[in-house]
Amino acid sequence: MSKRDYYEVLGVSRDTSEREIKKAYKRLAMKFHPDRNPGDKTAEANFKEIKEAYEILTDADKKAAYDQFGHAGVDPNRGGGGYGGGQGDFGDIFGDVFGDIFGGGRRGGQRQAARGSDLRYNLELSLEEAVKGLTKELRIPTLATCDLCEGSGAKKGTSATTCGTCHGQGQVQMRQGFFAVQQPCPTCHGRGKIIKDPCTKCHGDGRVEKSKTLSVKIPAGVDTGDRIRLAGEGEAGEFGAPAGDLYVQVSVREHAIFVRDGNNLYCEVPISFSKAALGGEIEVPTLDGKVSLKIPAETQTGRMFRLRGKGVKSVRSHAVGDLLCKVVMETPVNLNDRQKELLREFEATLTGESKKHSPKAEGFFDGVKKFFQDLNS
């Protein structure tokens, strides 16, 4: 009877991640585990099939061979004698030979337990939080060391035993014609040990899915794109190997008033026509509260004022940026009759004196006049 496709056995697609494969395995292993189905031969057969599929699809070398050659690529009985072992074995042999030559293959000896994967957490902050700094409580979904077996993967009271196929070496020698090469042991996958009685909680993986809460200090001055590394706070490693790291990726939300550029802040401040013409003091918002800003008489709209030290403290030095305020003159609206009359009277006083009171406007209209004269000449 031909074997079922390993991906079909676990109910996953060929592009599924290793983490999803592990989740599918754990779900099915719990369903068909012999301890839960005593005396059920069908469940026992299903469990063995699931375990075999899992062992192949979570081993990078075996998975690659299976994806290319199917079951023939991972059948240890097809490795003996001559070139009659089939295309799958021939390809695997040359893959290992050239992998060793160019540094891609494993050296002899047991496979080292893999370091835990790094994790990334996207943290969104307000501008105020980013500028002042704070401590955040982050809830991180991860793989943690199984507390029942303490990461060994073996059932409580038992331990891993020496592999009978490779006798603890983690490697087996295979011959193909004139070639003799070492490959990871297909039984223990290079570990040199096998777990006969897997832990009932982690099912032999040594790790379980878990969420943990971390208190993370965010330094003052961080900005979008900054990354904070927390060593050892990633996923737990395999069978006691070091854990990965956690990287907190910072992004800062847009602010209703301020725009940040490096350590400087920018904002627009509206002023009245009379304030721009006569001058005076206005209140300007900063991240530390309101401050007074003196507006000189005859200030034009768009003029920039710099408030030194009112920007952002650099996260990498003691430098502090500035706050740059651009004043924008507002045209008055909803005028009553008296206000309109006063503006007409004011406008009348400017007749014949536009160069004196509006030099930029007069210069602009002189330029327009000259442009049309040159055009018609």
From Swiss-Prot:
Notes on the domains: The J domain is necessary and sufficient to stimulate DnaK ATPase activity. Zinc center 1 plays an important role in the autonomous, DnaK-independent chaperone activity of DnaJ. Zinc center 2 is essential for interaction with DnaK and for DnaJ activity.
GO molecular function, one term: ATP binding
Chief location: cytoplasm
Cofactor: Zn(2+)
Binding site for Zn(2+) 1: 146, 149, 199, 202
The protein, known as: Chaperone protein DnaJ
Cellular compartments annotated: Cytoplasm
Listed GO CC annotations: cytoplasm
Cofactor binding comment, as recorded: Binds 2 Zn(2+) ions per monomer.
